[in-house]
């Protein structure tokens, strides 16, 4: 029997999907990411959303101002697609190195998405320009029609939006973000080299029973919502297989405690402090630690055509307790796995 590794030395990872918010929240959460990750794809769903080059430059500077001086971190900015967006603005931002990608939110699919896209036809000129540029499209893959059950919205999106879009623009590079279903896992697996996926720690670790059985656990509530266990297992099997077009994207999405623990609570898990240990645990449980570094540190840069990070970090097989809460100016943040014991710890 092969001895279990006690230390994992991996190339510094990147987070290919994160929400850093703004203001005091931004200042609180950025260091949890900048300490461990070389880069992060920053979501543009602020209020108002990031739709111009100037707005992205200003937001990038606010992020950099929140990075501790001893951290080496590069935020990668994204453009929020709207029905009225000018293709020239997107091209300008991409060519100037301001926009790394553009984000498609179906209108009202998630937090601060009311400005999102009402139909693919409305943004076709932008998407055609992105295809020519080789600029990645990042997709929140859920339909938002009221008659579609929330647990079916991802699968329906594949049929009615994603596949027709990819047939229409066959050279467009697409990241199917935070996939949550067996349907999506199989769709990405069977796709070509222009289609990739990010997967969150919560969707690998948990299913809807964990969120709903024995009481509602609001800090596991995120969008896309946790699905049944067969979908969780499909995601775990995909990453454990060493599939090279799936990579780390935490979708860390902080909300103040009073906005999570409410009669109408917000969607999102603040997992930045615990995500790396969570991913390592999943790969360990699946007997697939040999694929962990590629998922965390290699697959993403290769898909985006970016260089690998040149520094390394180490995780050790060591138990530690996740802090119960994190102070904000006038509230608290509850991290993913608050108060629980994790079995991998980043060596500092």
From Swiss-Prot:
PROSITE patterns referenced in this protein's UniProt entry, alphabetically: DIHYDROOROTASE_1 (PS00482), DIHYDROOROTASE_2 (PS00483)
Active site (record annotation): 251
CDD domains: DHOase (cd01294)
Annotated SUPFAM superfamilies: Metallo-dependent hydrolases
Alphabetically ordered keywords of this record: Hydrolase, Metal-binding, Pyrimidine biosynthesis, Zinc
Binding sites annotated in the UniProt record for Zn(2+) 1: 17, 19, 103, 251
Pathway: Pyrimidine metabolism; UMP biosynthesis via de novo pathway; (S)-dihydroorotate from bicarbonate: step 3/3
Entry keyword annotation includes Aminoacyl-tRNA synthetase: no
EC numbers for this chain: 3.5.2.3
Enzyme type, top EC level: hydrolase
Biological processes per GO annotation: 'de novo' pyrimidine nucleobase biosynthetic process; 'de novo' UMP biosynthetic process
Residue positions binding substrate: 19-21, 45, 140, 223, 255, 267
Cofactor entry: Zn(2+)
Residue positions, PTM N6-carboxylysine: 103
Cofactor note: Binds 2 Zn(2+) ions per subunit.
GO CC, any one term: cytosol
Annotated residues for binding of Zn(2+) 2: 103, 140, 178
Catalysed reactions, as listed in the record: (S)-dihydroorotate + H2O = N-carbamoyl-L-aspartate + H(+)
GO molecular function, one term: zinc ion binding
Family: Belongs to the metallo-dependent hydrolases superfamily. DHOase family. Class II DHOase subfamily.
NCBIfam families in the record: pyrC_dimer
Subunit relationships: Homodimer.
Function: Catalyzes the reversible cyclization of carbamoyl aspartate to dihydroorotate.
Protein's name in the database: Dihydroorotase
Gene expressing this chain: pyrC
